[in-house]
């Protein structure tokens, strides 16, 4: 995917959203754009650095990734009860997982996060808040497995004994987001020449 493109890129990793502030300091002017692994990290950049003008694109866990994961889980366990699965990616936005899986509710659109609803304080606490929900539901015996969109909490959930899954986006989808970023970079460079 990225190997097929004639671009230079650098990958920065974070453990929690609070790390993004410090990682961003390494994203110097030589970088023409930023691609993040989700709308939440992109939102954190906007909250920390309101003056950032470079294009920021992101890839989320898309609907196809969730359906692929749930199909895999159903193939492993035909009796899977979705009322006993906690999926923060839909629950955070008030969508019931069973309704989503059965096609009665769409996946929440998290491409644009409101700075009012998702302010800095909430964003800095959301990972631990969700970690706590997963662990509490697991320890209370209310769920048989968890699905999280926060890759940063997966190791801690596994350490706590929670049966947790992370729905990875497809290579094609990530490639599309890379193309979107490259197109946005090119568009902005052309605008500067006019």
Annotated model-derived regions:
Residues 1-194:
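Alpha-helical/coil-rich non-catalytic "connector" segments in signaling and regulatory proteins
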């Amino acid at each position: 995917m990225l190997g097929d493109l004639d671009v230079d890129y650098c990958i920065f990793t974070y453990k929690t959203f609070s790390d993004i502030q410090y990682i961003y300091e390494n994203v110097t002017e030589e970088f023409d754009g930023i691609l993040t692994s989700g709308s939440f990290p992109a939102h954190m950049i906007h909250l920390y650095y309101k003056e950032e003008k470079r294009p920021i694109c992101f890839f989320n866990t898309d609907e196809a990734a969730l359906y692929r994961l749930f199909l895999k889980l159903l193939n492993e366990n035909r009796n899977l009860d979705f009322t006993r699965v906690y999926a923060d990616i839909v629950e955070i936005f008030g969508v019931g997982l069973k309704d989503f899986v059965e096609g009665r509710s769409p996946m929440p659109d998290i491409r644009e996060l409101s700075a009012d609803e998702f302010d800095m304080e909430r964003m800095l606490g959301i990972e631990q808040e969700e970690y706590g929900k997963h662990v509490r539901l697991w320890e209370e015996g209310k769920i048989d497995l968890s699905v999280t969109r926060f890759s940063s909490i997966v190791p801690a959930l596994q350490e706590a004994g929670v049966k947790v899954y992370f729905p990875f986006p497809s290579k094609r989808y990530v490639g599309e987001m890379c193309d979107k970023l490259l197109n946005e970079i090119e568009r902005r460079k052309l605008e500067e020449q006019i």
